[in-house]
Swiss-Prot record:
Its main location: membrane. Residues 425-434 have a biased composition (Acidic residues). One of its GO terms (molecular function) is proton motive force dependent protein transmembrane transporter activity. It holds the Pfam family TatC. Keywords: Cell membrane, Membrane, Protein transport, Translocation, Transmembrane, Transmembrane helix, Transport. It comes from Haloferax volcanii (strain ATCC 29605 / DSM 3757 / JCM 8879 / NBRC 14742 / NCIMB 2012 / VKM B-1768 / DS2). This is Sec-independent protein translocase protein TatCt.
Amino acid sequence: MSSALDEDTQQTIAAGRETAGAMLRAAQKDLQKVFIVFLVGFLGTFYALRLYVWEFFRGVTKAQMDASVSGNVSIIAQTPFDVILLQAKIGLVVGVLFALPPFIYVSRGALKARDAWPKSPVAPWKLALIGLTMVALFAAGVAYGYFVFFPFTFAFLAQNAISAGFTPSYSIVKWAQFIFLLTLSFGLASQLPLAMTGLSYAEVVPYELFRDKWRHAIVGIFAFGALFTPPDPFTQIMWAVPVILLYAFSLYLARVVVTAKRGSEKIDVKSTATTHWNLLAGVGVVVGLLVYAFYEYGGVELANDGLAAIGSDYVFLAPGSGVALGAFVVAGGFVGLAFGLAYLVYRDIERLERTEIGVGDPTKLDLSALDVAGVRAAPPEAFADLEEDEVMALASAAIDDGDKAKAQALIDRFDEAEADREAEAADAEDEPGELEDRTTRAGGAFVSELTEGETDEDDIGGYYTDIAFIVDSLTSRAFWVVGWFMLVLATTFGWLYTGGIRDVYDDFLGRLPAAVRPEEVLNVVALHPMEALIFEVKFSTILAVLATLPLVAYFVWPALRERNIIRKRRRTVFVWTGALAGGLLGGFALGYTYVAPTVITFLVEDALAANMIITYRITNFFWLIFFTTAGIGLLADVPILMVLLNTAGISYRMMRNRWREVTVFILAISAVFTPASITTMFMVTLPLMAAYGVGLGVLFVLTVGGRRDLSPARGAAE
């Protein structure tokens, strides 16, 4: 193993081992104390979960549910050890986190001896302030999750499952993982103000980058939220909107901090406060009086009535004494004073920023304030980012003022800047970029090594050329392909989401014998809060892929003909689509009418004979229905597709010789679109390969053992 690592890597690993050993030796006499801290964290977490946390989580889960929904929601343990093992795992993680700081502290001597102890020029109190800020922001994000997001999300998910005819019986493991994952996501997202401000202040990431790339940030926020939240728009918006607002606040805060840093010598907070002391005092008094009026003149009652109107259980409490009321008033006055001072300082910062921009940034030059000579003498950067409509507006304003020479000068300077931009763009197109050039060389070298400099049509070089040509021909039509895919996906998901899955469920149960239909005999449950929605997304994706394949075939058909892969004309796509759709629908009708009900009935009756309580997961139940309905149609389509491919020029011998590649491809597709189980993957792959074998048998008969294909093979003379 060591021979596989270079010398530098081996030295780094050895140094790490020595450092870890030195830390353990240095902390050896204090390991008992570290273990006690670990034990406190472990046992404290274990019993806190048992006595308080699970009940708190259950309360958060059902906070916004009405009585009918709440009565159907239950948290279950699938195995006897689920609860205790989950508590132990969480306790271990918390215990390690508790023990890590004291372990590092007691081993600091070894780290200092190896010069691995950080030497920060930042004062300890500043580090403590940053740490407290991080904790406060994390707590604020978690509070939003527990008191706003989770109650509405769980109520929505439970109602969605019940309306579809399922029972929300959440596994405690999956339920806890869902809560902890979203808790972590809210906690991390709440660090945006500190992260953006710190990066901008340290100039690691310029503030201008955060400001200019805000559209990319919004897309990233929604993408990040899609990984953690349910796939419905409501909960994604509830997650993304607060984070977007937090990004805007962070951007504002970063601007203040960066501008203050750049002009720190020209801003005097004390002088600003002294100059405007009367204004600050007035703001503090007004805010204090508003707090007093809120508590003394019906503000508490109005606020509580508003909270009750939106279904919230939270209430404002009136202070218990005059002393407490006075403290609230004084605190409100100081808060108003702080905000007033912050506003005045920010106003000074903005004035300074405008002054600096006006002096040093030619792109911010105000062209409307210049005369003819000023326009002609302005730097080219002042016109570089202007649009034509902006220049015409400036020229029109100059004409309205009677200055036609200035209007003509503006247009002339804009034309010059436009010509420079076009010349730069032409030069950029003529010279390939460094990354593109490297990619081309790397791809060419890779294919050349595999093909030994020759690109025969039947080796990997020939396949690479074919695939690259086909993909390139499809790129120009990618908008139509993606648009059609998304349309089918959204339509199917919307139908399932708005009650379609319940209609399918009820119709299918109506085809089962009466003995296996009562709820006490056959029950379908959701073990994960998002299980029903995830199944709807996967099923919609499969249908969208099937609906998009004919469109893809239509667009790539000319490229396939040009590469001599197929020989039929493009109108053949319609024949193919009709034949495959007929096979799919015929197999689906057969499976939905006879195969699926027979299989479900057999399984249920077998379980009833053993006196078992039958409870199926949503995913397992509906994937079973899918495989025994649409799966029959897909199996029927395999021989049909093979015959069609043979008529298009794919020879019988090629299909027979390439069965290994087909097997690997089907395994990969099964791994993506079926439940995460090796057994299920093989249960899908084996029938499809059996159908592939049937197709080979049919082609063997039709082509007389491969001697007479239904169409000339690829590469044959026309």
